[in-house]
Amino acid sequence: MKRVRFCLLVLLVLTTACKPTPKSGYIAVPTVTKNALSGVYTLSPKHSTAKLYYEELGQGESVILLHEHSVDCRMWDDVFYKLAKKYRVIRYDLRGYGKSDMPEVGFGFLQADDLCNFMDGLGIKKAHLAGLSLGGMTLADFVALYPERVLTATITSGAISAFPDRSKAPKQLLKIYNDTIFTLKRQEVDKNMKRGMDTLKMEWKGAMKSISGKHYRSIKRELNHMIDDWHAWQWTHPETDAFIGAQADSLLSKQKTHPPVLFLIGQYDSKGSKRSMQKMAALCKESRIEMIQDAGHFTAMECPDEFVNRMERFIDAH
């Protein structure tokens, strides 16, 4: 038994050593972005830009991967290296996560605007995009705001967010709304600080386990390690809304043509995630829904081979 374990360890070390080293760097994006509606401060931010950390590998058409809340771009490890055999693959830490800069409290930005500015910084006009949960919500906004920048979008574990449409609200009403939400979030931060990050993260890990599928054991260590590394900035600071929410509904319904969108639903994912993807699929004419059996919320981690195969088939078809 010891010999078997030793051989497996050697195989793991050799496999890791054989992985190509990706290029890494930072792209600066504006601290306050053009489509943001949630900022509460009118003064200039302390820093005019925020830096987004990214890794890049491979050649060909550009593929950009967007991660889930509470983790970082490492969640794409298996998918990243598989796709890099055929494409120029880029993964980055969204603002507020991983090695990227944290947001400035009170200043509004959209994750979708960050993605657009990030692509501009890398000289990418159009790309294939994939996002999981937080990343999927970002792509829902991006498809609504920047459809001309999308070759294909693969969205999994969440799409249109639940934030109300504030785009047509009078400025004074919008200010009252933002100030009220900001005050409520300050109160949430106070409660979080009293409970402590260890307790909150332990509960969060349990919540992620409850919506994972049959392969949870295979991702548990890596997933929990990323959650442990997470700064939890969103729990310790009053966060502005980084999504357009229901505004995406009206934008998508007005679009005469839509970029091709693939929705990958994990069999054991939450009902809310499934509903948000089904809702967006109904608005996008060029969309397709597929279910990944035995997978839960973290489809790309739980079933990376199937995720890549389905994504590549969809890209090839368009």
Regions found by a protein language model. Name each.
Residues 257, 263-265:
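Short beta-strand/loop motif that positions the catalytic acidic residue
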Residues 187-255:
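Conserved alpha/beta-hydrolase catalytic His-Asp/Glu region
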Residues 50-101:
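Conserved HGGG/HGGXW glycine-rich cap/lid loop of the alpha/beta-hydrolase fold
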